[in-house]
Amino acid sequence: MRKLLLIVILFSSFFSQAQTKLYVHPDGKTYASNTKTIAILPLKVQVKLRPKQLKDFTTEQIIQLQKDEAIDIQKAMHTWFLTRKKRGSFDAKVITPARANALLKKADIDVHELDAYLPSELGEILGVDCVVMGTFETSKPMSNAASIALGALFGAFGTTQTAVCNIDFYNTADDELVVNYFKKIRGTIGSDAQDMINILMRKVTRRIPYTN
């Protein structure tokens, strides 16, 4: 009985620490095979600090922290895709974050308010077949500036962190959602944005039609 109870507890603990949901369009492989260029855009980031941490920051500082986090994650995802490309599991061209953000800025689009635009509108400006966008929530900011600031105020973070990532791959020709990847993880998610992306995207590479 004790062994059974222990197994149930361990299973429940594992399930609460990591939850993954993946949607792939029935014609996902066709969409992916027709994709020649991809743009990875800044995610909509929300950093959920504890009340003790929040009181030492202004609203403007929190907003800037989230914007910095979004750019860091965008760059980390770009690197992740380039690594897949180098390994031969990814063929499409990925435009750089600097180019994507500059083109959007030139079109008077705030890169942190992309949910106000259709993927087709963004795709036309960027000249890409697919845009990657979504949301990200975390209890621990990964950007260097934020980590240094919070570390100075409150000391090192504990090992337990929470992150919820919801990433969408849209075909820009018809605004079709080709892939939705949702992952919630509780535990150690790395020391920077690149570590975090590697952990969040682990084991899903071969299940996404763009990278299998």
Q: In which residue ranges do the predicted regions lie?
A:
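Histidine- and/or cysteine-centered catalytic micro-motif in compact active-site loops
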Residues: 3, 97, 136-139
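Sec-dependent N-terminal signal peptides
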Residues: 3-14
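A generic structural signal for short, solvent-exposed coil/turn residues
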Residues: 10-12, 32, 86, 159
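C-terminal/domain-edge helix-coil "capping" segments
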Residues: 19-49, 125, 136-147, 154-212
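N-terminal segment of the mature soluble domain
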Residues: 44-46, 50-133, 172-183, 203, ...
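Glycine-rich, flexible loop segments associated with nucleotide phosphate handling
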Residues: 62-71, 153-163
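Charged helix-capping and loop-helix junction motifs
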Residues: 116, 151-152
